Regions:
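Low-complexity, acidic interaction segments enriched in glycine
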Residues: 64, 132-134, 205-320
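Alpha-solenoid helical repeat scaffolds
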Residues: 124-126, 141-142, 159-165, 177, ...
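Short coil/linker segments at helix-helix boundaries
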Residues: 25-111, 118-172, 177, 184-185
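Short, Lys/Arg-rich N-terminal segment immediately upstream of the first membrane anchor
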Residues: 1-6
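Structural marker of alpha-solenoid helical repeat scaffolds
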Residues: 115, 154-155, 188-189, 222-225
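Residue-level recognition of tetratricopeptide repeat
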Residues: 118-120, 158, 192-193, 210, ...
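Hydrophobic membrane-insertion alpha-helices, especially the h-region
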Residues: 7-24
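Soluble catalytic domains of enzymes that build or remodel membrane lipids, polysaccharides, and related
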Residues: 177, 185, 197, 202-210, ...
Length: 320
């Protein structure tokens, strides 16, 4: 009997070691031979229930494998699509199916979180990936919210997921009222930080005001449990700073155009008349551009491109 127990224990250890080795080998292979888009055209198992049955006691390890594939798929697809610029418009298929550019992303994330329903990083990262507009993501805030709500069904006390749902509503569906409602709901969870209440009030009162956007990203950064999310919040805050600078520079360009009777189309002409000291750089260190019609904008080569689409102000609530 003891012999059987030892044999079974050894078999389990061997199985875990082999699966871990397979993950390492696959990761090394992907680094050496980056995959193309066609290779990722199928998901290993399409049914979360089937995946759980196949993984048996190793569902958490299997979730790690699917999470790695999710990251590889998202990163590889994003690099491929962004390398196809300057065709910045989404493909026609996106008009009918907004996830056409990343068709496997949600299925992979759904499998990952079904195998490990407490996979916090997969919910929070995955929601950002899903909500990102094309070509940086599939532009599916509805699926981002669905993923976070799936996490909330497992952990109703996870105020961070409610915060993220509000964030998706604010930035991607441009529904400031729904965002404020999510922040308000999160603020009532035991252990939630005090600033959620003020964030809800600010969002409801100011709507699309850039200051409330900045406050929101500061809140996301404060709640981030991993460095990547903090870095993403820093990038978004830099984008907001760039929008402030673009407004200021646009005022300079418009003033010069009014005085000179024609719009400047480059920075040297503004430097010569002494209205700016040099070529203005965005927070990432790339020069801003002046379009032919005199509009100041971010360079498409900047890490801050594309600039965020700012939410609109909240409409007044109709009387009861």
């Amino acid at each position: 009997m003891r012999h059987d127990g030892v044999t079974l224990g050894a078999a389990i250890v061997l199985a875990i070691a082999l699966m871990a080795a397979a993950v390492r080998v696959q990761a090394a292979r992907d680094r050496a031979y980056p995959s193309g888009g066609d290779e990722e055209a199928t998901v290993y198992v399409t049914s979360p229930a089937a995946a759980r049955r196949m993984s048996l006691a190793y569902s958490t390890l299997a979730a790690d494998v699917y999470w790695i594939r999710s990251l590889q798929y998202y990163g590889g697809t994003k690099r491929r699509l962004e390398s196809e610029r300057p065709q910045l418009a989404p493909p026609p298929a996106l008009a009918a199916d907004p996830s056409a550019g990343y068709p496997l992303l949600y299925p992979l994330l759904d499998l990952t979180t079904s195998l490990d329903p407490l996979f916090n990083v997969a919910y929070r990262f995955g929601a950002i990936f899903l909500a990102e507009p094309y070509p940086g993501g599939p532009g599916r805030p509805d699926l981002a919210i669905a993923l976070l709500e799936k996490g909330l069904r497992q952990r109703p006390d996870k105020w961070e997921y409610m915060l993220d749902i509000g964030f998706v509503h604010y930035w991607f569906t441009h529904d400031s009222r729904a965002a404020a409602d999510s922040f308000e709901k999160a603020s009532h969870v035991t252990g939630a930080p005090w600033w959620l209440q003020s964030l809800a009030a600010t969002t409801l009162a100011q709507g699309g005001d850039r200051r409330s956007s900045r406050q929101m990203w500061v809140a996301i950064r404060q709640s981030a449990e991993i460095d990547w999310l903090k870095q993403e919040a820093d990038r978004r805050l830099a984008q907001l700073l760039a929008l402030d600078e673009i407004d200021r520079l646009q005022h300079v360009v418009d003033t010069v155009a009014e005085r000179a009777g024609q719009r400047p189309t480059d920075w040297p002409s503004l430097i010569r008349v002494g209205v700016i000291p040099g070529v203005p750089l965005d927070p990432a260190g790339r020069p801003y551009e002046i379009a032919s019609e005199g509009t100041v904008r971010l360079s498409r080569t900047s890490p801050l491109w594309p600039p965020p689409e700012e939410p609109q102000a909240v409409a007044a609530r109709p009387p009861a």
